[in-house]
Structures are given as structure tokens and as C-alpha cells.
């Protein structure tokens, strides 16, 4: 890693759209990293955002924020990729595959050529497929290529459960796993409120109906569509999730977060990036937590993985993209 050992933490953000600009804002507000470079093809807008963000520093903490070039990634600790074609109303994340794979190659190649030796964090959609593509295009070790995965989905899940039972969302422990998209699934078997399983909570609180739990998951799964139809894009939630992941990396936290990670036998899956709880620190992914799933949950995991694998295989064949591994 380039700078973490020196107590100077540097992030390069590629993509200054709605998600990227809010992510940079979240880093600024939370005092994460000492240096943030922003790369985008719309350079004037990026320069404006860098100046605007810098104006907030007197209220937050010292930081260097600037419009960057790909070459600035050379000594960065983390490169965060949010650039890509946006998801339109009525469009699934998987509809974006071919467009965003082409864009991704134009990003990863110059980043690698800069001499970058840190961690890739991918948020562009479809995130599981683009994380896999970043790994293939970069030639980086699988531990140092990470996708935002189901981090936002799990946060939504916890928040909605918390609202239903009237507790703090931070006291709810629950995961969404699989694809960040239509085939994701809730891990009800391990969901708990302060250590009490959801199933036990429902028994003890008759006012909580099991049908409400089903509606909660459907709301979580479809949240992006709802938000996009209402305001055109999602960015506050995912920008904050990316800031949380970045902090876990830079501060060497060994945090357990639901991320898009490379499967090497876990859950019976191989050669795919998919959402699962994993331990993350400044080295990247150090351990994938293989949660004991029910038969139904395991079936859902494999269904999700099959869809992702089928699409990524087809996309790479059709686009004939040259990779480094």
C-alpha cells in the first residue's frame, strides 16, 4: 500500500457524477483521508466541485481536494470507481453491462499504468460484474479488488426492520446477500435485534406480522427503482456506504461488511464476485465469512451467482475485451 504506513491517506475518485460527488462530500464531512483527487471527463465541473468541497474544510478537518488525472493514482491507497452510465427509470442494473464494461476499460488501464498499487473499490453498476471486470482488467490480487456489493441493501434492510420494531438501526444485525440487484436475498436465518433472532422477536411481539417482513425485503430490493423514479438517481445512501468502506480500509479496522468479493470455494461458488459479509482492512479482504445458510437461502445464493456468471461470460465474449488475467 502506498501511503497508509506514513499516516497520509490518499484516495482517487473516478467519476464526479451524483454518486461520486456525494462520496467526496461524505469523505470531507467525516474527515476521512488527507488527500482526495477527483478524476472525470468533465474537467470544469470537477474543478468546481473540488473548490466547493475545499470551502468546507474550515468546518471539518485539513484535507487536500483537487481535480486529478489518472497519473495521480500512482501513490494512492484506494481508487474508487463510480463512473459509468447511470441507471434510467425502468432499466435494471444488468441492462448497463455492455455500456459500463467499455467505460471501465478506459479507466482501469490508465490507473494500472500509473503504477497504482493500492485497493480498487468499485461502485458503478452492475457492481458485481464490474468488480469482476476490474479484477480481470487490472491483474490485481482478488483481495485488493472490492465492490460495494450489498452494503447499501443491508443498510436499507436494517433501517426498515428497525422502523418496524421501533429500535435503533445500529442495534439490528441483518444481511442482504447475493447480487446487488434483482436476485439478492435476505438472510432471515441470522437476522437479529440486539441478539434476539427475528423469528423469536415476532413470537414475542404479536403486533409484528410475518407478512410485514416479506414486504420489508421487497421494499429493500426495489428501493433503487423507487428512488430513481422519484428523483432520477440514488446517491446519498451509496455515497455514505462507500465512505464507510473507505474508512474501514484506511483505518485498518478489520471490519465485517457485506461487500462484493471473489468466491474461491465459499458457498460452493468459484470465479465470481458476489455479495457476502467479509473482513476488510488496509490489505483488502482478509476473510470471507461463510455464514451457515438455510437450504432456501443457499439456493437463492446459487441462483443469484448463476445469473451473474451467465451475464459476465456472455458480455466478455461479445465485447472481446483483453484482460490481464
Curated annotation (Swiss-Prot):
- Which residues constitute the catalytic centre? 180
- NCBIfam families linked to this entry: L-LDH-NAD, PRK00066.1, PRK06223.1
Record has Oxidoreductase as a keyword: yes
Question: Which keywords appear in this protein's UniProt record, sorted alphabetically?
Answer: Allosteric enzyme, Cytoplasm, NAD, Oxidoreductase, Phosphoprotein
What is the activity-regulation note? Allosterically activated by fructose 1,6-bisphosphate (FBP).
- SUPFAM superfamilies tied to this protein: LDH C-terminal domain-like, NAD(P)-binding Rossmann-fold domains
- Any one biological process term the GO annotation gives: lactate metabolic process
Q: Assembly and partners?
A: Homotetramer.
Which residues hold substrate?
87, 93, 125-128, 153-156, 234
Spell out the protein name for this chain: L-lactate dehydrogenase
Q: Which residues carry this modification: Phosphotyrosine?
A: 225
Q: Which reaction does it catalyse?
A: (S)-lactate + NAD(+) = pyruvate + NADH + H(+)
Query: Mind naming one GO cellular-component term on file for this protein?
Result: cytoplasm
| Broad class of enzyme this protein falls into | oxidoreductase
EC assignment: 1.1.1.27
Task: Give me the residues that bind beta-D-fructose 1,6-bisphosphate, please.
Answer: 158, 173
Give the location in the cell.
Cytoplasm
Which residues make up the binding site for NAD(+)? 19, 40, 45, 70, 84-85, 106, 123-125, 148
Q: Which organism is it from?
A: Latilactobacillus sakei
Cysteine-cysteine disulfides = none
One Gene Ontology term of the molecular function aspect? L-lactate dehydrogenase activity
Q: Specify where it is mainly localized.
A: cytoplasm
Protein role: Catalyzes the conversion of lactate to pyruvate.
Amino acid at each position: 500500500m502506498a501511503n497508509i504506513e506514513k499516516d497520509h491517506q490518499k484516495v482517487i475518485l473516478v467519476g464526479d457524477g451524483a454518486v461520486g460527488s456525494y462520496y467526496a462530500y461524505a469523505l470531507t464531512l467525516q474527515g476521512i483521508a488527507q488527500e482526495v483527487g477527483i478524476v472525470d471527463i468533465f474537467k470544469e465541473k470537477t474543478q468546481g466541485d473540488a473548490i466547493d468541497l475545499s470551502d468546507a474544510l474550515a468546518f471539518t478537518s485539513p484535507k487536500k481536494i483537487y481535480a486529478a488525472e489518472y497519473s495521480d493514482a500512482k501513490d494512492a491507497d484506494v481508487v474508487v470507481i463510480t463512473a459509468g452510465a447511470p441507471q434510467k427509470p425502468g432499466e435494471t442494473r444488468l441492462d448497463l453491462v455492455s455500456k459500463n464494461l467499455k467505460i471501465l476499460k478506459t479507466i482501469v488501464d490508465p490507473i494500472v499504468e500509473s503504477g497504482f498499487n493500492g485497493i480498487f473499490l468499485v461502485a458503478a453498476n452492475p457492481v458485481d460484474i464490474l468488480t469482476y471486470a476490474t479484477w480481470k482488467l487490472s491483474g490485481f490480487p482478488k483481495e485488493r479488488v472490492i465492490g460495494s456489493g450489498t452494503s447499501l441493501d443491508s443498510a436499507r434492510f436494517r433501517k426498515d426492520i428497525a422502523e418496524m420494531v421501533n429500535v435503533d438501526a445500529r442495534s439490528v444485525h441483518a444481511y442482504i446477500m447475493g447480487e446487488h440487484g434483482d436476485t439478492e436475498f435476505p438472510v432471515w436465518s441470522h437476522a437479529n435485534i440486539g441478539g434476539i433472532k427475528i423469528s423469536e422477536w415476532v413470537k414475542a411481539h404479536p403486533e409484528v406480522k410475518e407478512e410485514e417482513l416479506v414486504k420489508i425485503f421487497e421494499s429493500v430490493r426495489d428501493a433503487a427503482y423507487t428512488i430513481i423514479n422519484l428523483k432520477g438517481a440514488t446517491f446519498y445512501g451509496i455515497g455514505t456506504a462507500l465512505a464507510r468502506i473507505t474508512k474501514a480500509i484506511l483505518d485498518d479496522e478489520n471490519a465485517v461488511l457485506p461487500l462484493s468479493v471473489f468466491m474461491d470455494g465459499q458457498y460452493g461458488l468459484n470465479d465470481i464476485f458476489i455479495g457476502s459479509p467479509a473482513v476488510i482492512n488496509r490489505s483488502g479482504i482478509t476473510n470471507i465469512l461463510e455464514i451457515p445458510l438455510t437450504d432456501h437461502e443457499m439456493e437463492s445464493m446459487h441462483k443469484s451467482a448463476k445469473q451473474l456468471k451467465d451475464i459476465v461470460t456472455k458480455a466478455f465474449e461479445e465485447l472481446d475485451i483483453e484482460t490481464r488475467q
